[in-house]
Amino acid sequence: VPRLLFFHYDNGSRSQKVAIDLLKTFKGYLQCDGYSAYDAFENRKDVRLCGCLAHIRRHIESCREENREYAMQGLKFIQDLYNVEYMADERQLSYEERAALRQRLAGPLLDAFELWLQNTYPKVLKRSLMGKAIAYAYPLIPRMRHYLYDGRIFIDNNRAENALRPMVLTRKNMLFCGNRQAAENTAVICSLLGSCNCLLYTSDAADE
């Protein structure tokens, strides 16, 4: 299946309504961070929300100076989960084989991580960085479990995050698009160029 990149602009809004309108006919796996706008898809039978371990790691990573002991414990669970992915990559496993490996190795790790989050939360201040990190991560564990059973699902959505970075940098440099139509046009152009990069088209075109 070709990888396509799609940028969407809707009057500068990131509201839940924008996500619902955009994805009202979508069916399948929807991988995202913990942004509350996606909660609307939690109970849709034709959509499975998948979590992003990189976002969970980012929140726990931010606690290293405040509470190094707990932060390192949490990061160890996360690193072990990523190590399973590295193992699957090295073995060049099929989707089915990757899912089987995840269920055998990553499943127990995810269970242990969930238990650690549950047991650690009462030991920290809710308003502390660690308290907020755990409050972010714990509700997302059920969403993370979906990747255990389908090798096509990534453990995180870093590919989407990496595709977004050039757009963010461009936005900082340009400051403004000028008007809404210009912003919509920018989204179309970025979608086209981003998809070409995903398909390695621009590299071939440049070589020719």
Each model region followed by its residue ranges:
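Long, amphipathic alpha-helical stalk/connector segments used for oligomerization, subunit docking
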Residues: 82-140
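A conserved active-site cap/scaffold subdomain adjacent to cofactor or substrate pockets
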Residues: 64-88
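Catalytic phosphate/nucleotide-handling subdomain of diverse soluble enzymes
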Residues: 177-199
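RNase H-like nuclease fold core
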Residues: 1-32, 36-44
